[in-house]
């Protein structure tokens, strides 16, 4: 079986396992599917020939590819996450393989009229000639991050079967609950034992990311007073209208749909409620730490103003930091970025360095003492029914993993 065939076989099998995380769950991991998937990977890592294969009580899978060199090479790690996003259903995924893709629109689901078009997704024609894997239009695909996970498995298998490629000790980890921000919560950095690592959790070809948002979450509870609308004058306080009022005080243009690059935002993720009580959940993002703190202060000030206007119980704020910009922790060990950059260039891949408008496990792990940049996996349009992945780009990602390992040994 060649690399491409192994990638397709593993990936299409892995995405059929429902591993969506669940923000409302307090178990670790938050869903049983992640445990099921982790157990499968433990067996397959052993079959490949890795050693020290473990899965702890929290669902974290770790394994070792022993060094095949006498050189003193730093221990490097490669990570991916077990769970898939909660934004769209991930149950009963039916991956569709399109070989030698013609670059034109693909009807994902004729019955539901779900069509993947170049008009909506202009990057689509650039994959002409590739083998791409799409959804059937009814679920997400789960390339985030089963593409990255598959690539690590295939790369480790390749290195075991090609001992002429010299490398130091490599550690592999698969983590649960990344999509809900809890990936590193129970990650044992000391047990992992790597000097630094790479998450395989990026997007299109060439992606190399070592800057992430500073991130916070804000949960607002608006408490109203419900009375009969016919006699409500000077009595009723509509909680949903309080939520609308709060949102109106935020800058309209500082939302995800109006921002790009290094611009931060406020994002209303959900709003549920009625006259008596409404709950709004926001995420707050910015690359610059000062701007990040200013955004949080703005939320606090709006809440304070509304409390003065309507009473302290009218608006209740719970706000917490989620992760910070990893750049601060990557800069002192910049060589790990340089080696990934050089690895890509040597494979005729043009590195595309840009800030992550999101977070990876690496954002938090970098602050836990494990500097962890992020590398592309080949996926597009994550978290929805138009998600797809190029197997040709997945193959390139496997080559990058192998080349990074080789270069660390060569330069030791």
Curated annotation (Swiss-Prot):
Cofactor, free-text remark: Binds 2 Zn(2+) ions per subunit.
Binding residues for Zn(2+) 1: 81, 144, 201
Catalytic residues identified in the record: 83, 178 (proton acceptor)
Record's keyword annotation contains Mitochondrion: no
Organism in which the protein naturally occurs: Bacillus cereus (strain Q1)
SUPFAM superfamilies: Bacterial exopeptidase dimerisation domain, Zn-dependent exopeptidases
Binding-site positions, Zn(2+) 2: 144, 179, 383
Compartments where found: Cytoplasm
Domain of life per record: Bacteria
One GO MF term attached to the UniProt entry: metallopeptidase activity
Keyword match Metal-binding: yes
Keywords carried by this UniProt record: Aminopeptidase, Cytoplasm, Hydrolase, Metal-binding, Metalloprotease, Protease, Zinc
UniProt-recorded name of the protein: Peptidase T
InterPro entries: ArgE/DapE_CS (IPR001261), Bact_exopeptidase_dim_dom (IPR036264), Peptidase_M20 (IPR002933), Peptidase_M20_dimer (IPR011650), Peptidase_M20B (IPR010161)
Pfam families given in the database record: M20_dimer, Peptidase_M20
PANTHER family: PEPTIDASE T
Catalysed reaction, written as an equation: Release of the N-terminal residue from a tripeptide
Entry EC no(s): 3.4.11.4
HAMAP family linked to this entry: Aminopeptidase_M20
Family named by the database record: Belongs to the peptidase M20B family.
GO cellular component term, pick one: cytosol
């Amino acid at each position: 079986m060649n690399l491409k065939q192994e990638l397709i076989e593993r990936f299409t099998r892995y995405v059929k396992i429902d591993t969506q995380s669940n923000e409302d769950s307090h178990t670790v991991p938050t869903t049983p599917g992640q445990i099921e998937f982790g157990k499968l990977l433990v067996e397959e890592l052993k079959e490949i020939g890795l050693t020290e294969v473990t899965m702890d009580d929290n669902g974290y899978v770790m394994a070792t590819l022993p060094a095949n060199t006498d050189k003193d090479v730093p221990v490097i790690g490669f990570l991916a996450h077990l769970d898939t996003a909660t934004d769209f259903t991930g149950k009963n995924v039916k991956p569709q393989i399109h070989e030698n893709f013609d670059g034109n629109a693909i009807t994902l689901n004729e019955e539901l009229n779900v069509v993947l078009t170049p008009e909506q997704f202009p990057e689509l024609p650039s994959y002409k000639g590739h083998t791409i894997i799409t959804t059937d239009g009814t679920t997400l695909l789960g390339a985030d991050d089963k593409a990255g996970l598959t690539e690590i498995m295939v790369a480790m298998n390749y290195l075991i079967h090609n001992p002429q490629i010299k490398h130091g000790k490599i550690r592999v980890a698969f983590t649960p609950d990344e999509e809900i921000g809890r990936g590193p919560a129970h990650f044992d950095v000391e047990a992992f034992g790597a000097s630094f690592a790479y998450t395989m959790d990026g997007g299109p070809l060439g992606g190399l990311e070592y800057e992430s948002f500073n991130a916070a979450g804000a949960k607002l509870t608006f408490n109203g007073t419900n009375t009969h609308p016919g006699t409500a004058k000077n009595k009723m306080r509509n909680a949903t209208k309080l939520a609308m009022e709060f949102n109106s005080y935020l800058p309209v243009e500082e939302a995800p749909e109006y921002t790009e690059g290094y611009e931060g935002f406020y994002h209303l993720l959900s709003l549920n409620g009625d006259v008596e009580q409404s709950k709004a959940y926001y995420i707050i993002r910015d690359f610059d730490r000062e701007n990040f703190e200013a955004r949080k202060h703005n939320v606090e000030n709006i809440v304070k103003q509304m409390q003065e206007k309507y009473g302290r119980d009218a608006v209740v704020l719970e706000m917490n930091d989620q992760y910070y910009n990893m750049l601060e922790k990557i800069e002192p060990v910049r060589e790990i970025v340089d080696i990934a950059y050089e690895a890509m260039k040597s494979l005729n891949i043009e590195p595309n360095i840009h800030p992550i408008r999101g977070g990876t496990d690496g954002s938090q792990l970098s602050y836990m003492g494990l500097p962890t940049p992020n590398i592309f996996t080949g996926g597009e349009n994550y978290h929805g029914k138009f998600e797809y992945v190029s197997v040709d780009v997945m193959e390139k990602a496997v080559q990058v993993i192998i080349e990074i390992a080789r270069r660390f040994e060569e330069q030791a």
